[in-house]
Curated annotation (Swiss-Prot):
This is Transposon Tn7 transposition protein TnsE. Disulfide bonds: none annotated. Transmembrane segments: none annotated. Residues 330-360 are annotated as: Disordered. InterPro entries: TnsE_C (IPR041419), Transposition_TnsE (IPR016421). The keyword DNA-binding applies. TnsABC + TnsD promote high-frequency insertion of Tn7 into a specific target site known as att-Tn7 whereas TnsABC + TnsE promote low-frequency insertion into many different sites. One of its GO terms (biological process) is DNA recombination. Keywords: DNA recombination, DNA-binding, Plasmid, Transposable element, Transposition. Residues 311-330 bind DNA. The gene is tnsE. Pfam families: TnsE_C (PF18623).
Length: 538
């Protein structure tokens, strides 16, 4: 887990406050207080993706990021308020005064039996929607960043979006391997209400900033997008009387949005070699040595060097899902074989090689550039990637017709990016996905897992799970998806042992010829028989 270099291990956030910067300086910082108290009371604003109230920063143990409430928005009626409106905010006057001054929204949810006032810090809502990585933390406080760095065109007839990332853009190309970040880009550029919400951050800053004694400061606020039909999965705490609830962290978002049917994204790095005569000249360019993400530290002072690729660091990102995602295509431009290619080579390891900077990269910067944050993609891609599971879907059909099975749920999710591995992508650069299907037979329930092998890289057996708890399945499935990538596209059997016991999971071999889709009906039925047999041997 990446660390904030300035602070001690296992410190808990107790207050997130105003943004500030010295007059004439470009970089923004944000006040943050911890328990135990730390000498420094601020960090870079570009570190915001790591910060939420009550979160333990620089944790030496794995944190479980599980929601304890789900807020369903039947309407978008949010009242502007301050966090002090939440009763029992803090027993410490200093925290109560500073945290209480921060902006919030209040949403009232009513059931036949109770009424709850949800207090949602405005910065936390914006962090979950827009400020998902260091790049967006910088660009939101500029009126021109997106217009200068992206060229976007929408074709109404085809319901098709074109996003061209311009050569001058500082958007980290590694973030384009995070499928949820790409879907968020599509959402932002295709929905004017969403773009208006994002741009309102800069408008609120201009209207409400203060300058005193050479320091510019601002209490964060913005206009939220319409949220009707959304679900927020949150962690927080209730007031003593249980009538109010303070959202400390938004763990996940279910967004009711119809994204364009297809989106093409182009970036200067998306290149394919063009066949032809001529030679290619490779020139080595020095970069920082490779250090695992968990050993990296984010520096609060030093600048970032533009000569190194911006390293994208996922740090326990929260998740998001869209009701109708977009099918993403990467537009690749051919390059001639005689073209000169700049290749990054690792520099000699230095004692500061584990320090990185989320400052905007520029010439003369001291440290390697980094971008921290991201989003886990919890979108169900059943319809978009259905063709990758044609044989598996035929298996399900046989289970239903011949073995009286009932399908309880189907979901197709992308495999996440883990470390520097690229196995979460297929050969063509599209997301690799995994399908989970809940099945019931004779009163018993089990889950089938099938990994996308459409590019022929590797074909895993069908996994049969029993003893799955619907309450923990979302978290279990996230661990399983990461485990598949960490295990180099193998089943993470030690993880399955932990989750369901050694007898709670079985592998079922595919019929021969499945990769070429040349399987007889008899062999398909044999596959289904093995699935049923394994389920009943648990």
């Amino acid at each position: 887990m990446v660390r904030l270099a300035t602070f001690n291990d296992n410190v808990q956030v107790v207050h997130i406050g105003h943004l500030f910067r010295n007059s004439g300086h470009k970089e923004w910082r944000i006040f943050v207080w911890f328990n135990p108290m730390q000498e420094r009371k601020w960090t870079r604003f570009t570190h915001l993706p790591l910060l939420s109230r009550a979160k333990v920063v620089n944790s030496t143990t794995k944190q479980i990021n599980k929601a304890d409430r789900v807020i369903e928005f039947e309407a978008s009626d949010l009242q502007r308020a301050k966090i002090i409106d939440f009763p029992n905010l803090s027993s410490f006057a200093s925290v109560r005064n500073k945290d209480g001054a921060q902006s919030s929204f209040i949403y009232e949810a009513e059931t036949p039996y109770s009424k709850t006032r949800y207090h949602i810090p405005q910065l936390e809502l914006a962090r979950s929607l827009f400020l998902i990585n260091s790049y967006f933390c910088r660009s939101c406080l500029s009126s021109t960043a997106l217009q200068q760095e992206f060229d976007v065109q929408y074709e109404v007839e085809r319901d098709h979006l074109e996003i061209r990332i311009l050569p001058s853009s500082s958007f980290p190309k590694g973030a384009l391997e995070q499928s949820a970040v790409v879907q968020l880009l599509v959402w932002l550029f295709s929905d004017q209400d969403v773009m208006d919400s994002y741009e309102s951050i800069f408008r609120h800053y201009q209207q409400n900033r203060e300058i005193k004694n050479g320091v510019e400061s601002w209490c964060f606020s913005f206009d939220p997008p319409p949220m009707q039909g959304w679900k927020l999965h949150v962690k927080g705490r209730s007031s003593n009387e249980d009538k109010d609830y303070l959202v400390e962290e938004i763990v996940g978002l279910e967004i009711n949005a119809m994204l364009p049917s297809t989106t093409a994204i182009s970036h200067a790095s998306f290149q394919e070699k063009e066949a032809g005569d001529g030679s290619t000249q490779h020139i080595a360019v020095s970069t920082e040595s490779v250090v695992d993400d968990e050993h990296l530290q984010l520096d609060d002072e030093e600048t970032a060097n533009i000569d190194t690729d911006t390293r994208v660091i996922e740090a326990e990102p929260t998740w998001i899902s869209f009701s109708r995602p977009s099918r993403i295509e990467k537009s690749r431009r051919a390059r001639k074989s005689s073209q000169t290619i700049l290749e990054k080579e690792e520099a000699t390891t230095s004692e500061n090689s584990n320090l990185v900077s989320t400052d905007e990269p520029h010439l003369g910067g001291v440290l390697a550039a980094a971008d921290v944050g991201g989003k886990q993609d919890a979108t169900n891609y059943n319809s978009i990637f259905a063709n990758r599971f044609a044989a598996f879907d035929e298996l399900l059909s046989i289970l239903k017709t011949k073995f009286a099975c009932r399908v309880l749920f189907e979901e197709t999710l992308v495999l996440p990016k883990v470390g520097r591995s690229r196995l979460h992508l297929c050969k063509d650069g599209s997301p690799r996905v995994i399908k989970a299907v809940g099945v019931q037979r004779n009163g018993s329930e089990f889950v089938l897992l099938e990994v996308d092998a459409s590019d022929g890289v590797k074909m895993l057996s069908t996994k049969v799970l029993s003893g799955v708890d619907s309450e923990t399945w979302r978290n279990d499935f996230e661990k399983i998806r990461r485990g598949v990538v960490k295990s180099s596209l193998n089943w993470p059997n030690s993880l399955f042992d932990q989750l369901y016991g050694q007898d709670g999971h079985r592998g079922v071999n595919h019929p021969k010829g499945l990769g070429e889709l040349q399987v007889s009906r008899e062999d398909m039925e044999g596959w289904a028989e093995r699935v049923v047999r394994e389920q009943f041997t648990h």
